[in-house]
């Protein structure tokens, strides 16, 4: 039943991508994509509190925590929170919410993000682990976001997206994602890879690299490279 619910969510959202925050830069609105830390991308549920730190090539950084507080032998409910810093080490976004993770790798989450100078956004997201064995893991993800700007004459608007993640032996991974915002008729795309550099039962260090681009009726970007490192820790 849980898997069917998540599957219906994926269909309704047209398959999703992970997107942290929306920034407004006059006169162009744009969506900034990011890679979730490993603790949120893991396809196998754990019952430990855990956190992650990320450092990116553009100078931005972030921290995220996930603390289980309820559940049974199949499903775990956790409180989640994160803080993102700009390349000038100022607050870029702060997020809080709840997540439901299933032992088979499926999941749901509901979060609220506050972006200084912009406003808030509410995001509902889901993931379905479509294949898993000792060597391969494939997960499809979806999200829908209601953006609520605190800016004069800018209405609330929606962003939806989708993506798929692949991992080989918990060592090498790849992902592809896309997002669409009707209000500005903008599409965002990203292709990413991950390499695990160090791993113990409670600690993981990963290298992430990829390319991203966007297009609107008025302008398009080229594929822009990005890379970073993440440290995940279970407690």
UniProtKB/Swiss-Prot annotation:
InterPro entries: Attacin_C, Attacin_N. GO terms for biological process: defense response to bacterium; innate immune response. It comes from the Eukaryota. Residues 20-47 form a propeptide. Keywords: Antibiotic, Antimicrobial, Cleavage on pair of basic residues, Immunity, Innate immunity, Repeat, Secreted, Signal. Residues 1-19 form the signal peptide. Its main location: secreted. Attacin F appears to be derived by proteolytic digestion of attacin E. The keyword Transmembrane helix does not apply. Pfam families: Attacin_C, Attacin_N. One of its GO terms (cellular component) is extracellular region. Belongs to the attacin/sarcotoxin-2 family. Hemolymph antibacterial protein. There are six forms of attacin that are divided into two groups: acidic (E and F) and basic (A, B, C, and D). This is Attacin-E. It comes from Hyalophora cecropia.
């Amino acid at each position: 039943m849980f898997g069917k619910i998540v599957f219906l969510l994926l269909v309704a959202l047209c398959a999703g991508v992970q997107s942290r925050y929306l920034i407004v830069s006059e006169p162009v609105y744009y969506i900034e994509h990011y890679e979730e830390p490993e603790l949120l991308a893991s396809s196998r549920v754990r019952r430990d509190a855990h956190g992650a730190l990320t450092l990116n090539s553009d100078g931005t950084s972030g921290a995220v925590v996930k603390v289980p507080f309820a559940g049974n032998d199949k499903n775990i409910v956790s409180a989640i929170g994160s803080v993102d810093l700009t390349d000038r080490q100022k607050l870029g976004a702060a997020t809080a919410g709840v997540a439901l993770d299933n032992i088979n790798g499926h999941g749901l989450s509901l979060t609220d993000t506050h972006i200084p100078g912009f406003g808030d956004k509410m995001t509902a997201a889901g993931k379905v682990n479509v294949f898993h064995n000792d060597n391969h893991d494939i997960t499809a993800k979806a999200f829908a976001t209601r953006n609520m700007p605190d800016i004069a004459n800018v209405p609330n608007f929606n962003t939806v997206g989708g993506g798929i993640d692949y991992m080989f032996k918990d060592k090498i991974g790849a992902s592809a994602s896309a997002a669409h915002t009707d209000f500005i008729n903008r599409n965002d795309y990203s292709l990413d890879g991950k390499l695990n550099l160090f791993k113990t039962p409670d600690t993981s260090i990963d290298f992430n690299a990829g390319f991203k681009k966007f297009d609107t009726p008025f302008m398009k970007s080229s594929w822009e490279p990005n890379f970073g490192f993440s440290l995940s820790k279970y407690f």
